[in-house]
Design a protein with these regions (language model features):
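Alpha-helical transmembrane segments of MFS and MFS-like solute carriers/permeases
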Residues: 13-17, 86-87, 125, 181
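Generic alpha-helical secondary structure signal
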Residues: 57, 61, 135-138, 179
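Cytosolic coiled-coil signaling helices that couple upstream sensory modules
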Residues: 86-157
Length: 181
């Protein structure tokens, strides 16, 4: 069971990571607007990308739970792929639904008069870009798990080496005492 401080640390890391992604994408959108001669206000660019990233930040714990429950391992690989495939579609749709709801508030462009119209437009333009985001979260969780396993293996190997050294010392020490007498 994860401690509360561990949960807070992980939640803070998720929020910080998604905030960084939002700011990087907002910066890219702002620069692209300047280059095209279509200036985009920084507040508007950052608002748009913060909403997108906040939706993914809210969806990240779901992806992490699924990554832990259905790890991409040889034993049940196809089942895990199926679960994550469905989850990636569901999370992408959820992200677009949240963004379609918030888009008018943050000043997103190319909106339709209705939420459904905006959602449909997003479905056609950003769905294929949102699906891999889920897979990146799952891949990051997998890499973290592999790193944690490697650290644990190294720790156990160090303990084993130390135990062997202590056992060897215990075996050698009586012989020296006996020979000294």
């Amino acid at each position: 069971m994860r401690s509360e401080s561990g949960f807070n640390r992980r939640a803070t890391a998720v929020l910080a990571a998604w905030t960084l992604v939002a700011l990087l994408l907002a910066g890219q959108a702002w620069v692209a607007g300047q280059v095209r001669g279509e200036p985009l206000a920084w507040a508007r660019a950052s608002g748009i990308w913060i909403v997108w990233a906040a939706a993914w930040a809210a969806l990240t714990p779901i992806a992490l739970q699924l990554a832990a429950r259905f790890p991409l391992q040889r034993a049940h690989f196809f089942r895990a792929i199926a679960v994550h495939g469905l989850a990636s579609v569901a999370c992408a749709l959820a992200n677009m639904a949240i963004f379609a709801l918030a888009a008018p508030v943050v000043g997103a462009t190319q909106l339709e008069p209705t939420w459904l119209g905006t959602f449909t437009r997003l479905l056609g333009t950003t769905f294929i870009l949102n699906v891999p985001v889920y897979w990146l979260v799952v891949a990051a969780a997998r890499l973290e798990r592999l790193a944690r396993t490697a650290r644990e293996k190294d720790r156990l190997e160090a303990q084993l080496a130390d135990a062997r050294l202590q056992a060897l010392r215990a075996q050698l020490q009586p012989h020296f005492l006996f020979n000294a007498l």
